Regions:
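Short alpha-helical transmembrane segments in multi-pass integral membrane proteins
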Residues: 1-22, 80-147, 191-247, 303-368, ...
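N-terminal transmembrane alpha-helices
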Residues: 9-46, 60-75, 79, 104-108, ...
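Transmembrane helical elements of multi-pass membrane transporters/channels
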Residues: 20-39, 141, 152, 175, ...
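Transmembrane alpha-helix boundary and packing residues in multipass membrane permease domains
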Residues: 25, 29, 41, 78, ...
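Residue-level hotspots within the lipid-embedded alpha helices of multi-pass solute transporters
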Residues: 29-33, 67, 107, 111, ...
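Helix-terminus/linker motif at the lipid-water interface of multi-pass membrane proteins
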Residues: 34-53, 122-129, 185-194, 250, ...
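Small-residue-rich hydrophobic transmembrane alpha-helices
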Residues: 52-112, 149-168, 277-335, 339, ...
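Short runs within selected transmembrane alpha-helices of multi-pass transporters and secretion channels
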Residues: 70-73, 141-160, 168-176, 197-213, ...
Length: 449
């Protein structure tokens, strides 16, 4: 039985398929933290700290809002991959149109309501008047990227669903490189300060959208999909399923945001050195996320395609191949953090007190790659299978476990936070794993998609 389970590992085609989808997404993800570093470096060289504080405050508001709407990418990937695998050209086209309409609708609502939303959130902030002023300045310009940013979710998801990971990679790279270049031009060259940083991000998002639309149009013609005009009267077909899937993934995202936000805010109550140490360790946790996300995206595309084709053998090969490479990456990260964790911390901060605090909590980071691997992979499986309800329910359980563990071990202070985060990652994997194994053994996983 064991030999039959792992037999796909002897097939070079399985490894090529996994790596062809995963590596471009990992490479594009690497540009995301690079963009943040360049933004901070450019604004940080201006003559007052409140410029950097304002950009940080405004960009956080935008980032959290857009991140919560990231369900548009996940749902589009799963549904497009299933349509692609089932060779249903009309449904493949409808998925793109429905996703686009939903993205533009959310963008319109955000543009209409952004002023009262900003007034409310900035009113809650304890930041200085200068930081609030520049934060609002950044936000009021950056908000106009909403149509492009949300459309980019749909474009990325649809292209990935059609088993094309190179186009999404270049979309992300073009967006981020454009942003970096315009940051340098507008802020350092023309002296536009905060307005320049915001405008650079807006133009970058639209440049990525234009490139993505060109890639979609190319695929549309190659696959001979029906023209959008012919489908205008059919956009309601399957819309109920699309809306329900987006609702469930949105609720899942809210729970995820609640856990990570609590980690940040609660850590601040344990002192400046502790919150700084957590920030250093969380930056490494983001590296784990960016690396594993590439394999999760590959899993989404391959699982969705296999389900669309009703091909259990192809599905098994996708699962085993992605598991193998994910395990290899996680073992490598565990070894890296275990053997060179102190040196990595020293590269991030030269403050001795922060280094000492980070070293205290480093063991939690060492176990995190293997603890979190399962939730990333299973997220990919369930996104590809468009099982939003299962993802939502398992996330409810995992988030509850996060808060229960923290309050049960609250006397451990920051160790309790890291224990809660580790249990959160484990419970996400365990919850989805139990559901998956039950449905797989009952032979209902494919049937219920």
């Amino acid at each position: 039985v064991t030999n039959s389970i792992f037999s796909p590992l002897s097939n070079p085609q399985v490894h090529r398929q996994v790596l062809a989808l995963a590596i471009p997404m990992v490479l594009s993800n690497i540009t995301v933290p690079l963009l943040g570093l360049v933004d901070a470096a450019v604004i940080g060289h201006l003559d007052h700290a409140w410029y950097l504080g304002g950009v940080a405050l405004g960009s956080t508001m935008i980032s959290v809002t857009f991140w919560l709407l990231g369900f548009l990418r996940m749902s589009t990937t799963g549904l497009a991959a299933q349509s692609y695998g089932g060779e249903d050209r009309k449904q493949l086209a409808l998925v793109f149109m429905q996703g686009s309409l939903m993205a533009l609708l959310f963008a319109l609502v955000f543009l209409i309501a952004h002023t009262p939303i900003a007034d409310l959130i900035f009113g809650w902030s304890d930041a200085s008047a200068e930081v609030k002023h520049y934060g609002m300045q950044y936000f009021s310009i950056r908000v106009w990227s909403a149509p492009a940013a949300l459309m980019n979710f749909v474009l990325l998801g649809w292209l990935l669903g059609t088993q094309n990971s190179k186009a999404p990679m270049w979309m992300v790279i073009i967006t981020n490189v454009t942003n970096i270049a315009l940051d340098l031009l507008f802020v350092m060259g023309l002296g536009w300060k905060v307005e320049g940083a915001a405008l650079a991000s807006v133009i970058a998002d639209y440049s990525g959208m234009v490139f993505g639309l060109m890639c979609v149009w190319k695929t549309w013609r190659e696959r001979q999909l029906p023209s959008p005009q012919k489908l205008l009267t059919s956009t309601h077909h399957g819309l109920g399923r699309f809306v329900k899937l987006n609702r469930d993934i949105f609720l899942r995202s809210l729970c995820l945001q609640a856990a990570f936000s609590f980690m940040t805010f609660q850590g601040a109550s344990f002192g400046d050195e502790v919150v700084a140490a957590n920030a250093v360790l969380m930056s490494f946790l983001m590296i784990i996320s960016y690396g594993m996300d590439g394999f999760a995206y590959a899993m989404e595309a391959m699982v969705g395609k296999a389900i669309g084709a009703k091909d259990r053998q192809q599905l098994s090969a996708s699962l085993v191949g992605t598991f193998f490479w994910s395990l290899a990456i996680c073992l490598g990260l565990t070894a890296l953090f275990g053997l060179a964790g102190s040196q990595l911390i020293a590269m991030i901060t030269s403050i001795e007190a922060v280094q000492q605090q980070a070293a205290v909590y480093l063991p939690w980071l060492v176990v995190m790659p293997l603890a979190s691997m399962w939730c990333f992979l299973l997220d990919g499986i369930f996104v590809g299978a468009t099982k939003g309800k299962d993802m939502r329910n398992s996330m409810f359980v995992a988030t509850s476990s996060f808060f229960v563990v923290f309050y049960l071990f609250a006397e451990w202070e920051n160790h309790a936070l890291w224990f809660a985060m580790t249990s959160f990652m484990l419970m996400r994997g365990i919850g989805l794993g139990v559901i998956f194994l039950y449905q797989w053994r009952k032979d209902t996983f494919l049937a219920q998609c």
